[in-house]
Amino acid sequence: MKRIAQIRVLALATLSAGIVCAPLLQAQEDPTLDATRRVFGYIGPGFRAVRRGPDGSYYVLAPPPPPPAAPVKSFTASKVPPPPSPAVLIFDSRGKELRHIPAQTRPGEVVSPSALDLDTSGRVYIADQSANSVSVYTASGTLVAHFLVPEPTQIVALPHDQFAVCSANADRLIAVYDLQGKLLREFGEMEDLSDDPELNHRLNAGHLAADKAGNLYFAFRYLPEPTVRKYDSASGLLLDELSLTTLDLQPMAQSARQEIARADSGKPVNPHEIISAFGMDPETQEFWLALGNLLIHFDNADNITASNRIYTTYAIRMVPNSILVEKDHLLLSNDPLGIYEFARSSASVHRSE
């Protein structure tokens, strides 16, 4: 059943107007949610994703810290080493780094990982868009499966030794595979946003998440009207769709569609990112959407319970590209700002943008 959310939140009205004429307008006094602390201090540039393992450890997809610089004997002869490739960095609950996955990378095993997830047994799933592959590791870092998957951009572990991916060039939003690399099913109708097939695939990119029952949630990154779909992962049936289409959001949607229409005239297109991050509580089915630095909290009946503008511990405006929902708090992450802890509930502080 499709739901059209009736939102009358001042923060949303301000956001939609600001996208059209941001230099001319200042945000109103919106409720503010400030970070309580920064975690995993050196994580920042190159960050991709963070997950919590069943053992309580954190798995962070990001470049490891560079090795100590060797003494430079000659300025002319010195070379700047290339930045390290992203890996899965594992931290304990206190933030102490424990190990990396893979510990020793084989040629072609991991090229440019784009996403990761963990299943209930602790296996680590890594999607590598550049290498057109998915790798699966044990919690200790042993490779147990590696197979070709076309341009995977998102990955979610599912029950029954299956996993779901989003691919950059697929004709369906979601594909489900088993651990032998066999494609089991594809589902999710793409939105028709452009006559250019390549651009239309790009505009149908999204964020993928799952709840404890294995239902899949797809949040469109670029669809002008913020939209989240819920699918049954076993059948591919569409169970629910939340679309924010009120008058408050029309200026934002109109601006996004105007940018997409530029492609028809042959001009370079820079699509507006509408939903920058999506996070799901797998136990309660509550979820959070980030529209710019506006964080919106929904209950499991798609009702808005809170909306706040978010800031780091140094009062820096934050636009998250990852949301990890935990029992007592949220971890919001941004490349290059890093990973910050936030309360799940709203704050009473107000700050002008």
Regions found by a protein language model. Give the residues of each.
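A composition/secondary-structure signal for short, hydrophobic, low-basic-content segments
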Residues: K2, A22-L24
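Short amphipathic alpha-helical segments with coiled-coil-like heptad repeat character
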Residues: M1-K2, L237
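Bacterial N-terminal signal peptides that target proteins for export
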Residues: K2-A11
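Bacterial N-terminal signal peptides
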Residues: L10-A22
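Eukaryotic scaffold repeat domains enriched in small/polar residues
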Residues: A27-E353
